[in-house]
């Protein structure tokens, strides 16, 4: 039985939890060897029994049978396509149509958003928002795709009146870090949590008495250990992959939550500043 095909064809009939399971299995099919029903249930925020019932609905006796069948289907598919198709990104290959690529990318991003939001500690997030709101000065650090996420957050925060530095040059990042003071905040964005440039800046910020907030993965990392607060992001991408699409999606979901939370704390004045910004930029057209 071709379970992957069956999953795709039955998507319109799935309940909310069943759709979560289907999306996970399709996005993570290449990694199912290391996935248990318990681990999957925790990541998706559902019960193990829901996963077993989903497997049975597809005709398998349980999750183990479904998992092994999917692994076999994936391996057979890879053997068939390896001779002609190049592996481009995640589950996307060079012989996928644009429509298939769009579906795969959409599923990957949705999964990153769902898992990140499901695993966030919202009490901790609220505390972090309060800490940022009181900071005289905020520094945001990041490299590559994480730097783009940081730059976007910096623009949003400046729009509502916060003093923010977000420089792409790592030497400038380090220079700003050593000048931070007690009460200031450094937001360090790094999925791996192991980039030496980001760690150097975090160490300098801590030494100066600033509060370090890390937006990083669940992996135990040097940055996680350095930070006063962490906000976890979940992505299906690994260190060797050439792009960080779902990682940026997960990071942006967290930074957008920070921004909206800060707007809420000072909603009237924040909305006035956003409106003034809009009026000014309209005059530039």
UniProtKB/Swiss-Prot annotation:
Key words, A-Z: Carbohydrate metabolism, DNA-binding, Repressor, Transcription, Transcription regulation
Cysteines engaged in disulfide bonds, as pairs: none
Pathway as given in its UniProt record: Amino-sugar metabolism; N-acetylmuramate degradation [regulation]
All residue ranges annotated as the SIS domain in the record: 128-268
Record carries keyword Transmembrane helix: no
GO biological process: carbohydrate derivative metabolic process; N-acetylmuramic acid catabolic process; negative regulation of DNA-templated transcription; regulation of carbohydrate catabolic process
SUPFAM superfamilies, A to Z: Homeodomain-like (SSF46689), SIS domain (SSF53697)
One Pfam assignment: SIS
Annotated HTH rpiR-type domain residues: 1-77
Molecular functions per Gene Ontology: carbohydrate derivative binding; DNA binding; DNA-binding transcription factor activity
UniProt DNA-binding region: 37-56
The UniProt record lists the keyword Metal-binding: no
Function: Represses the expression of the murPQ operon involved in the uptake and degradation of N-acetylmuramic acid (MurNAc). Binds to two adjacent inverted repeats within the operator region. MurNAc 6-phosphate, the substrate of MurQ, is the specific inducer that weakens binding of MurR to the operator.
Record's subunit section: Homotetramer.
Protein name stated in the entry: HTH-type transcriptional regulator MurR
